[in-house]
């Protein structure tokens, strides 16, 4: 199986309308799964979740009214309400804030690598996306052609989201790791922040957008550019911390690593994030001539199974519910050659398919 692909053209509303019409089935899956997830993890009814998501509207409007128009188009095309699209785009803030570190659910292993660690000095980045297994059916591939100012976008969101992990024709990539914080505030939801970052052409611009304005939740954003540079930014309502590649390698999982954050944030409640970080370091650090194939192999790694880099359900015999997590895709991006390699589901079970920007 492969994800549905949609190319969005026209005005922001027209883009959203195309998105909603083309991905109506996948968006319905997102709505159904988030109704269950908000109830399971946060004890929220769907109406309560919709109401809570409205607090982020002022920050979205202040950033770009076009994003509001695009989300309205998605709602109209998919036959759902605007608030439901908004809740999908604010799902990180609704799910992950107000949680202690003991509530950690494993999500994602990310990397970036460049000279002197790669073969022919190519620049690579990527991640696994580990989340509720049922949401695997809701992932789509979104393309938005450039307009002469903003580059061509290629990203891989959950259906209904207008931002996500991906890359652009300027050779900039973006990956995401979930982090947890007890703090909560107003501000721009991380997936809207990610859309703005992907519209940038330089790493400096991307960094400025990553740290712009208040952050209502905690997240780790790894930004990499074909120029052979990368920045990793840990954000939460109290501030930011920045990590840089060491000898051409940068890796991150789901706990805080920045020097400031190590002093102010609790340890993670799950050992998975530490084990996956250690495995990523073993697979990428102090290596030479790293390639796309090497990264793909790393995403099939089962050390620490089932909560490994290639993650599998801990109770596979049980009926599949939103409580079961697994790797939903593996993504490797070659920024030098503007190519992405995507494996649906567990990379140990499915091939990586090449997609050009």
Spans of model-derived segments:
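C-terminus-biased signal that marks the final domain/tail of proteins
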Residues: 1-107, 199-240, 246-357
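Internal mixed beta-strand/loop scaffold within catalytic domains of large alpha/beta enzymes
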Residues: 91-192, 328-331, 340-343, 349-350
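Alpha-helix capping and helix-loop boundary segments enriched in small/acidic/polar residues
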Residues: 194-197
């Amino acid at each position: 199986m492969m994800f549905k692909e949609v190319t969005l053209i026209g005005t922001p509303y027209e883009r959203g309308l195309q998105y909603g019409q083309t991905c109506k089935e996948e968006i319905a899956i997102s709505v159904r799964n988030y109704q269950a997830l908000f109830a399971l993890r946060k004890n929220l009814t769907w109406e309560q979740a919709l109401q809570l998501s409205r607090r982020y509207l002022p920050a979205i409007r202040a950033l770009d009214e076009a994003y509001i128009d695009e989300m309205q188009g998605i709602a109209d095309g998919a036959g759902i309400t605007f608030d439901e699209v908004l809740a999908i785009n604010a799902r990180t803030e609704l799910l992950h804030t107000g949680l202690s570190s003991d509530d950690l659910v494993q999500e994602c292993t990310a990397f970036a690598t460049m000279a002197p660690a790669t073969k022919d000095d190519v620049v690579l980045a990527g991640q696994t996306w580990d989340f509720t297994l049922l949401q695997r059916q809701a992932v789509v591939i979104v393309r938005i052609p450039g307009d002469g100012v903003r580059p061509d976008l290629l990203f891989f969101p959950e259906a209904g989201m207008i931002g996500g992990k991906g890359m652009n024709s300027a050779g900039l990539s973006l990956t995401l790791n979930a982090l947890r914080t007890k703090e909560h505030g107003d501000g721009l939801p991380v997936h809207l922040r990610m859309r703005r970052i992907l519209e940038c052409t330089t790493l400096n611009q991307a960094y400025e957008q990553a740290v712009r304005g208040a952050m209502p939740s905690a997240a780790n954003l790894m930004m990499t550019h074909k120029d052979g540079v990368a920045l990793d930014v840990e954000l939460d309502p109290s501030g930011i911390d920045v990590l840089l590649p060491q000898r051409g390698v940068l890796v991150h999982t789901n706990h805080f690593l920045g020097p400031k954050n190590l002093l102010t944030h609790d340890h993670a409640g799950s050992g998975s994030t530490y084990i996956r970080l250690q495995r990523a370091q073993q697979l990428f650090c102090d290596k030479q001539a790293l390639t796309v194939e090497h990264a793909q192999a790393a995403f099939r790694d089962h050390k620490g199974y089932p909560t490994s880099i290639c993650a599998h359900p801990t109770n596979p015999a049980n009926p599949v519910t939103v409580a079961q997590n697994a790797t939903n895709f593996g993504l490797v991006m070659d920024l030098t050659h503007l190519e992405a390699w995507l494996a649906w589901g567990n990379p140990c079970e499915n091939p990586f398919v090449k997609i050009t920007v």
